[in-house]
Amino acid sequence: MDISAGIQASLAGRYASALFELAAEEGVVTAVESDLDKLHAALGESDDLKAVTNNPEISRKDQASAIEGVAGVLGLSPLTTKFLGTLAANRRLSKLGDMIRAFRTIAAAQRGEVTADVVSAHPLKDDQLESLKTKLTAREGRTVKLSPTVDPDLLGGLVVTIGSKRIDGSIRTRLNTLANAMKG
């Protein structure tokens, strides 16, 4: 398995690698990736779920019960549900977001894809996303999967991160650069 040492070196990477290997053995990588996408969306939408995963004062038992309930509501696969139970038992739910990102990276690498994190000041339209995807695919020489997010603090423009490469075309960065240049 060709997984970068950087991913495996982190705690989140080790858990993600283990989950990927189990999913690959069972032939359910796509299902687990879909489960993790649902879970990632739920984490973004629910402050209560964030609190359950990040609050160290919540007991392991209560975290496990809450996560099991969430898994049932979201209709997650048995492997993903068991994985989340393991995270709760080991007090690692706070690293869930990092584990999801690491799993996506590993799965994409296995498919010969690369993920581009795209941050914009406003939601991008489908045609804008498709155009960006086409240009990034041509630039990278392999299939690019976009992971768009919105950050109003950018004011305008985009910040695209692919692996360790960053393309920052945000107005915020341009204004900061101009302000620093004016300081002398």
From Swiss-Prot:
GO terms for molecular function: proton-transporting ATP synthase activity, rotational mechanism. The gene is atpH. It is a peripheral membrane protein. It is found in: Cell inner membrane. This is ATP synthase subunit delta. Belongs to the ATPase delta chain family. Keywords: ATP synthesis, Cell inner membrane, Cell membrane, CF(1), Hydrogen ion transport, Ion transport, Membrane, Transport. It comes from Erythrobacter litoralis (strain HTCC2594). InterPro entries: ATP_synth_OSCP/delta_N_sf (IPR026015), ATPase_OSCP/dsu (IPR000711). It holds the Pfam family OSCP. Its main location: membrane. SUPFAM superfamilies: N-terminal domain of the delta subunit of the F1F0-ATP synthase. Signal peptide: none annotated.
